[in-house]
Amino acid sequence: MYIAHTIDELRSHLAAFRRPAFVPTMGNLHEGHLALVKQAKPLGDVTVASIFVNRLQFLPHEDFDTYPRTWDSDCEKLRTAGCGVLFAPDEKALYPEPQTCKVHPDPALADILEGHFRPGFFVGVCTVVMKLFQCVQPRVAVFGKKDYQQLMMIRHMVRQFALPIEIVGSETFRADDGLALSSRNGYLSEAERAEAVQLSKALKAMAQAVQAGERDLAAIEARAMQALAQRGWQPDYLVLRRRSDLQAPSSANLAGEPLVALAAARLGGTRLIDNLEIDAMPS
């Protein structure tokens, strides 16, 4: 595995390839990340992963300084997964001067859900992904569906800027009990880890209610919020949205509309997110 620490090193090495397949990460890799790398391998002639903890997408009170940096372990995992190139710039390499030119995504998508609770988050995400795209020049990039809103944002950005990049969404990788894998799961205590599965269970209960014919979506959402709150969680949102644009669907017109249940909630000091796609109801 070739490791590039500067943009020039990366571009020089990738000049020999025609179809890079790219997986951007912030490190602290788990099996979910490695599944993305393995999915990317047959999609290009070289698989490129990046590790960069992007300051721009962290709010002042969030965990930028304490976000786990696990360099040696990450490199070994990527080698084992068959990654061909690792781009691991430091902050000075990727942001040699203050990043005053930023990507401000569509507020209709960026200012709801995660964007509402983490203002400016998607500006930071889209800006760093655009910059990484310019460095790697991939023909395909693989993102996990666990960050559902982020995936939609990246697809929208690629479409709006006519970037010649195919965006592939990969299914969420889960532990045996159903918990979505996340780098932040490591913050959980043993007791919190046992409790954390309740987030995916709440999403399943929401999906089952819709599939059983219940049409009062606000009531479904309220039940899910209450169920977690009663267990000691601090939920930000548990909502049912259209998959097409993440807007609230009409309860009276759900036929043929694919939905997604999305959740964000804090358990102790750890904020977890998850989602579950729901098949369209028959007409």
UniProtKB/Swiss-Prot annotation:
What does the record give as the reaction this protein catalyses? Answer: (R)-pantoate + beta-alanine + ATP = (R)-pantothenate + AMP + diphosphate + H(+)
Its subcellular locations are: Cytoplasm
Quote the pathway field.
Cofactor biosynthesis; (R)-pantothenate biosynthesis; (R)-pantothenate from (R)-pantoate and beta-alanine: step 1/1
- Annotated (R)-pantoate binding lies at Q57, Q150
Q: Which residues form the active site?
A: H33 (proton donor)
Q: What does this protein do?
A: Catalyzes the condensation of pantoate with beta-alanine in an ATP-dependent reaction via a pantoyl-adenylate intermediate.
Similarity comment:
Belongs to the pantothenate synthetase family.
Q: What is this protein called?
A: Pantothenate synthetase
**Gene that specifies this protein:** panC
